[in-house]
């Protein structure tokens, strides 16, 4: 297996719903680092697993859609907590739709992981293993 990954910064806002500290239930901002790691079973004819430029363009597009946005206002989070776990899921599914809408061949893709880093030492991720 081969893994290729990229990282980008992102600032989003959210508020937690439920029994949390007062500062967590009011809208507040996080400076996240989002990491996208793609795993493929074999390299293409050029010796690459995935095109880093394509990954960067797609991740940048998805990040532009949430940069500075209050996540709770997005339809995806209407019935979900705006946790970093669900933020990773949202980003992973958004990336899948971006690539699928272009007809990107997913037959070689085995998994991808989206990690959302909240600090230098804390992150949550979603691992996608189905690409249809």
Predicted feature locations:
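Charge-rich, low-complexity N-terminal segments
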Residues: 1-132
């Amino acid at each position: 297996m081969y893994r290729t990954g990229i990282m980008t910064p992102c600032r989003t806002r959210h508020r937690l719903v439920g029994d949390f500290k007062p500062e967590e239930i009011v809208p507040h901002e996080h400076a996240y680092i989002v990491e996208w790691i793609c795993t493929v079973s074999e390299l293409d004819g050029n010796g690459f697993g995935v095109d880093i430029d394509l990954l960067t363009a797609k991740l940048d597009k998805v990040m532009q859609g949430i940069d500075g946005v209050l996540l709770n206002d997005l339809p995806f989070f209407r019935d979900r907590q705006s946790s970093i776990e669900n933020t990773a899921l949202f980003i992973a599914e958004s990336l899948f739709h971006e690539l699928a809408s272009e007809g990107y061949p997913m037959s070689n893709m085995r998994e991808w992981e989206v990690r959302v880093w909240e600090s230098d030492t804390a992150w949550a991720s979603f691992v996608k293993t189905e690409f249809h």
